[in-house]
Amino acid sequence: ISEACNVLNKGGIIAYPTDTLYGLGCDSKNEQSIKKLNKIKNRSGPISVIAPNRRTAIDWMFVKKNHEATIKNKLKNGNTIIAPIKNNICSNLIAGNKNTVGIRVPDHLFCKKLSKLFPHPITSTSVNRTGEKPLTKPDDISNEFISDIDLIIDDVIINCVGSKIFLFENCSWKQRRR
């Protein structure tokens, strides 16, 4: 975990295991890292981040107090919530329309420890180039991205699907991905 934090602090890119898929991570406040990540993915645009716990995730969001319990409940099971975020939480390069960002709390010990130790939100996007299937084996990740990624955290082969994604907008919910 300390090695991953060092790589992130230096503007590097990591591939790390989550409870759903391997993720590509960088410091969400480091614009050079985000540009490098976008180049790896062959795209630009919104990128989700991970939080160490639901309280932190809600603290990053710009939502009314009376919506917090519902959001906290939706964050269960590794779901991603797209919601407006407070200023200076992440770079605008990862934000979507209306200053929204997808935030999730993975049910994976490595993610929880890493996101608790690192001082900024860490990006979490599947390990693949846009339009291709996510890579689930550390060896495949290494072979495909050997010159692009600074550190691969080798856990196990992960054969899951991506998280469910919910959009919280204008006090209502829309499911974006099942």
Specify the residue positions occupied by each region the protein language model found.
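Active-site-adjacent structural elements in enzyme catalytic cores
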Residues: 1-178
